[in-house]
């Protein structure tokens, strides 16, 4: 009889433990006004849109523990979708602007650069979509991991963070490679233009010099020699002017490339800092959950032991 009573008590306590009281999710208040980072206020429109996307994620991460489950609500998903669409729209416009600047470059080079920029744009969109889908999976993953050990929970969390960091670093490295290809293509087009100008004007200058020498040797008239020399000087001045304009254009392209490189490096550093902050925030989310699970399990064990001990105590007899 005591054994049956102990088994019934254990089953009853286990059933009570299985019915975990659900936490009432408070409603999100009005979304605060978001601003792009100060460093991106003077950047390209697509950079400002991407800054608003990351600012929104940072705001979501600063929510209190009582509203963490609201991260998966339809409102957050809709906001992220709108910011992603805005970023991709501005990025397409910036890509069209770059293609117009590459008009002096050869058709083959321009097509290659356009294809590579389009691939980088697709990878950026895929990574942003992965961030949104990963937020949507957190609730189901937490519910699935409630019955697992602490070590397995921490291992899965660390694995997710490592994958996110590697992906961000890989995207930054790929953007730097695309920038190097763009710089090489611009320099190649400018140098090709200078060479073509030299090839066209070189024979004219030589022809002018030869004609001036012929006229000077055949005619002894001083005015004719002066006119020939003046004509040669005008051709030389024209060639130098064209060469100077080409060099100025090349310097301008180099300056633009350096500005883009500096912006990408700054964004890479910001993305690394955001990844580290995101990792620390996730750890602070999951550690209280693990500690609460341990306390509940310890309380359940103590209740079962107390119940078994109470049922095992012999009842004193009235007969002496």
Swiss-Prot record:
Residues 82-199 are annotated as: 8 X 22 AA approximate tandem repeats. Gene3D superfamilies: Apolipoprotein. The keyword Nuclease does not apply. One of its GO terms (molecular function) is phosphatidylcholine-sterol O-acyltransferase activator activity. Residues 212-293 are annotated as: Lipid-binding and lipoprotein association. Residues 1-18 form the signal peptide. This is Apolipoprotein E. It comes from Saimiri boliviensis boliviensis. The gene is APOE.
């Amino acid at each position: 009889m005591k054994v049956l009573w102990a088994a019934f008590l254990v089953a009853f306590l286990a059933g009570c433990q299985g019915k975990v009281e659900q936490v009432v999710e408070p409603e999100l208040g009005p979304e605060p006004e978001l601003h792009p980072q100060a460093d991106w206020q003077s950047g390209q429109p697509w950079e400002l849109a991407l800054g608003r996307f990351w600012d929104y994620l940072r705001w979501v991460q600063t929510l209190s523990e009582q509203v963490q489950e609201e991260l998966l609500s339809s409102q957050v998903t809709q906001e992220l979708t709108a910011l992603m669409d805005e970023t991709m729209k501005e990025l397409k416009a910036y890509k069209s602007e770059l293609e117009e600047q590459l008009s002096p470059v050869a058709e083959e080079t321009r097509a290659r650069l356009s294809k590579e920029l389009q691939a980088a744009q697709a990878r950026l969109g895929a990574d942003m979509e992965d961030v949104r889908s990963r937020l949507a999976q957190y609730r189901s993953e937490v519910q699935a991991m409630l019955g697992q050990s602490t070590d397995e929970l921490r291992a899965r969390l660390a694995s997710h963070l490592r994958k996110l960091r590697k992906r961000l670093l890989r995207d930054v490295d790929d953007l730097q490679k695309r920038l190097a290809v763009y710089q090489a293509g611009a320099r190649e087009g400018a140098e090709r233009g200078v060479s073509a100008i030299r090839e066209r004007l070189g024979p004219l200058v030589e022809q002018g010099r030869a004609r001036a020498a012929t006229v000077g040797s055949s005619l002894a008239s001083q005015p004719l020699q002066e006119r020939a020399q003046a004509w040669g000087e005008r051709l030389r001045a024209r060639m130098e002017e064209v060469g100077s304009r080409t060099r100025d254009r090349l310097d301008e392209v180099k300056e633009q490339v350096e500005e883009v490189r500096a912006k990408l490096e700054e964004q890479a550093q910001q993305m690394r800092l955001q990844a580290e902050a995101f990792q620390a925030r996730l750890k602070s989310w999951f550690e209280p959950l693990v500690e609460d699970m341990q306390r509940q399990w310890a309380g359940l064990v103590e209740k079962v032991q107390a119940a078994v001990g109470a049922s095992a105590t012999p009842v004193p007899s009235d007969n002496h």
